[in-house]
């Protein structure tokens, strides 16, 4: 159930170039039960920036009432958020959206989790939940260069983990699809989050597979009221049918929406 709460900053640190790990504490964490959901953050106490920032939920610890977000500080809003210090309060709205369907993966099956850039974080909580139910996980994490690689070791603790960098400075040179080809990776179910180009490449390969993708989209309200994040349905070539990424997604079955 969505709530709004002022949450306490437990810790914040830069873990890669311009990539920040922010841990917040509050009872709102008890509502975070679907990996792949996100929160809407008010990054400053004043009027500017006006709009909240959508950030995915990376890790949930309900015993401590803490959750972790990873985000890239690149615009005014996220750069402001990066200045928040331990003990300060952050206005959080969430959890929002529909997450990854963990129930679609069965014990004994192999799940392939593919993340690109800042689309990697929501896959971490998903991976933990899949492992807990007896699913074998394989991770492929794609980044531009070694300076922005993060959480490789954490994913490796859960299952086989491969990294691709576009410039070849770490792991496989190229894209996540190059890793799949190079290692002949097979799987029963696919979960992915990242840039559209990556999602399109995966959709082109795996239309017949059970697969789910999470879209990264700019949002206004985050609750389905402003229609700023709509995407069209593949089944309607007229373009008149659509779904909202914030409330109907951000996770969709592969082949449902136009990428």
Curated annotation (Swiss-Prot):
Gene Ontology BP terms: 'de novo' UMP biosynthetic process
Keyword check for Flavoprotein: yes
Domain of life the protein comes from: Bacteria
Cofactor(s) for this UniProt protein: [2Fe-2S] cluster; FAD
Protein name, per record: Dihydroorotate dehydrogenase B (NAD(+)), electron transfer subunit
Cofactor info, note text: Binds 1 [2Fe-2S] cluster per subunit. Binds 1 FAD per subunit.
Keyword Transmembrane: no
Domain FAD-binding FR-type positions: 2-102
Residues that, per the record, bind [2Fe-2S] cluster: 221, 226, 229, 246
Organism (species): Bacillus cereus (strain ATCC 14579 / DSM 31 / CCUG 7414 / JCM 2152 / NBRC 15305 / NCIMB 9373 / NCTC 2599 / NRRL B-3711)
Cysteines joined through disulfide linkages: none
